[in-house]
């Protein structure tokens, strides 16, 4: 099975933390069947309204999913996945 590329929205304050290397995980509804080895491109939105796109350096980076956790205290239908920058 080929690795999927997911384009997912992220608020600007969280984008800053990912871009700075402080946030190396995402908590997401698992409606896309995230898998280890999949890729993530982030689409950054303003914090204030969450509707407008931001020209943020994170939008030019790609991340690989390194680990996916579901169950074990994670709400049904959600997952936490680890990410590392690849470009």
Question: What residue ranges belong to the model's regions?
Answer:
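Catalytic phosphate/metal-binding cores of nucleic-acid and nucleotide-processing enzymes, i.e., regions
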Residues: 2-87
């Amino acid at each position: 099975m080929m690795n999927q590329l997911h384009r997912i929205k992220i608020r600007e304050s969280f984008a800053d933390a990912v871009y700075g290397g402080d946030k190396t995980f995402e908590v997401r509804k698992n409606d896309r069947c995230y898998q280890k080895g999949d890729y993530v491109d982030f689409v950054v939105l303003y914090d204030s309204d969450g509707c407008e796109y931001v020209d943020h350096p994170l939008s030019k980076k790609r991340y690989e999913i390194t680990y996916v956790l579901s169950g074990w205290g994670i709400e049904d239908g959600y997952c936490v996945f680890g990410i590392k920058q690849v470009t």
